[in-house]
C-alpha cells in the first residue's frame, strides 16, 4: 500500500523526498511517510488508519516532526507545501 502510494506521490511531487532529506538529514522513513500523507492533505484520522496508529499518536508524531524541523510558528502543512 505504501509503495504504491509513494510511487504515485513521486510522480506528482518528484523532488519532495530529496528536498526534505536535504533540509533534515536525520528524518526517518516513518517521518517521510507522515510528511507525504500530510502533504496530500490527509486528516489525522485517515493518516492513523494508513499507519495503523491511534489518531492521538499521529498528533504526537506531528508535534515531534515540527520540533525536528524547527518550524517555529509556521504550520507543518505550509512548510510541506513549500517543498
Q: Each PLM stretch: what is its role?
A:
Residues 2-83:
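Cytosolic nucleotide-binding catalytic cores of signal-transduction proteins
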Amino acid at each position: 500500500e505504501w509503495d504504491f502510494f509513494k510511487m504515485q506521490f513521486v510522480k506528482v511531487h518528484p523532488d519532495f523526498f530529496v528536498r526534505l532529506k536535504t533540509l533534515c538529514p536525520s528524518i526517518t522513513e516513518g517521518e517521510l511517510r507522515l510528511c507525504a500523507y500530510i502533504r496530500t492533505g490527509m486528516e489525522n484520522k485517515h493518516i492513523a488508519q494508513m499507519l495503523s496508529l491511534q489518531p492521538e499518536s499521529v498528533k504526537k508524531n506531528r508535534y515531534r516532526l515540527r520540533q525536528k524541523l524547527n518550524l517555529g510558528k509556521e504550520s507543518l502543512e505550509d512548510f510541506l507545501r513549500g517543498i
